[in-house]
Amino acid sequence: MVVVGKTSAIAAGVCGALFLGYCIYFDRKRRSDPNFKNRLREKRRKQKIAKERAGQSRLPDLKDAEAVQKFFLEEIQLGEELLAQGDFEKGVDHLTNAIAICGQPQQLLQVLQQTLPPPVFQMLLTKLPTINQRIGNAQNLAEDDVE
């Protein structure tokens, strides 16, 4: 019985050492690649650009009333559809976008409070500050572009 435990411990130790050697070998091989740093920088740059585009492209020009109204209606519709499908996270994201650019957010919040289940409405309330901050940043960027 002691022999089986000792054998298992030795086997586990050997497997761990082999795994560690495998990790070290491939990490060294990857790092010694002359293009590794360039590919890593390029990958990070593309991710950063994609993230910026995803955040900025969704918001309409806040000075164009027609674009804002169209965006508002699309976001409400998408939010309702996603909530009906059970995708609460994305549905709430769209509803928060609509609330953030709405001219009368308090009235819209009252309507949503009456129509949404309480947990979904709470999720909506927790996401509002982040979307308001994002829209504020987008307005600041637009003002900086004008100057």
Swiss-Prot record:
Subcellular location: Mitochondrion outer membrane
TM annotation in the entry: 4-26
Pfam family, one: MAS20
Principal location class: mitochondrion
Keywords: Membrane, Mitochondrion, Mitochondrion outer membrane, Phosphoprotein, Protein transport, Transmembrane, Transmembrane helix, Transport
GO cellular-component term (any): mitochondrial outer membrane translocase complex
Membrane found in the keyword field: yes
SUPFAM superfamilies associated with the record: Mitochondrial import receptor subunit Tom20
GO biological process terms on file: intracellular protein transport; protein targeting
Intervals, Cytoplasmic compartment: 27-147
InterPro entries (alphabetical): MAS20, MAS20_rcpt_metazoan, Tom20_dom_sf
Bilayer topology annotation: Single-pass membrane protein
Membrane side Mitochondrial intermembrane: residue ranges: 1-3
Function: Central component of the receptor complex responsible for the recognition and translocation of cytosolically synthesized mitochondrial preproteins. Together with tom22 functions as the transit peptide receptor at the surface of the mitochondrion outer membrane and facilitates the movement of preproteins into the tom40 translocation pore.
Protein family: Belongs to the Tom20 family.
SUBUNIT field: Forms part of the preprotein translocase complex of the outer mitochondrial membrane (TOM complex). Interacts with tom22.
Protein name listed in UniProt: Mitochondrial import receptor subunit TOM20 homolog
Gene: tomm20
